Amino acid sequence: MKLFEYESKKILSDYDIPVPKGYILSDISQLKNNMNPLVVKAQVLTGGRYKKGLVKFYDNSLQAREPIIDLLNQTFEGEKIQTILVEEMIKIKNSYYLSFYIDRDLGKILIIFSEEGGVDIENIRKEKISIEYLDPYVGLSNFIYKNITSYKTP
């Protein structure tokens, strides 16, 4: 199952995990003037959106208006962009990469974590990435949780 970023953030928020304030829109008439500065993120099921010009930063909503219209009129990798996530811009102290992938052959969930998050997880050296398997019937054990959260790069 693939989730859009806004769907993932809704799940995190439901479990009281802080996420930036934001909202989704599918039409420019839904653009609000309550966030300055802001981040505009096209919601497509692909990685590398920033490098592909699908994540942009603006000082105010007026500045973001035309680019949002352009994004909503784009097709990306054969799929029309239908939804935009608009979020408050926050100062980033640290950036991490965390991914959960279902390994159907093993019947387990693969957790991939790196303290070098951000744009190019594919280009991070292997020794900077922590990989653990999670048995869905056991859950996130303390061992795995400690391994991932205390992971330090060499």
Task: Give the location of each predicted region.
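Short beta-strand-to-loop capping motifs
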Residues: 26, 57-60, 88, 100-102
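General structural feature for long, well-ordered alpha-helical segments within catalytic domains
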Residues: 4-11, 63-67, 140-144
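Catalytic core of tubulin tyrosine ligase-like
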Residues: 15, 64-66, 70-77
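Glycine-rich phosphate-binding loop of ATP-grasp-fold ATP-dependent ligases
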Residues: 20-22, 40-67, 97, 119-126
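Hydrophobic alpha-helical hairpins/lids featuring a short glycine-rich hinge
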Residues: 78-136
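A long amphipathic alpha-helix within ATP-dependent nucleotide-binding catalytic cores
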Residues: 141-154
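A conserved helix-loop-beta module that forms one wall/lid of the active-site cleft
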Residues: 1-37, 42, 150
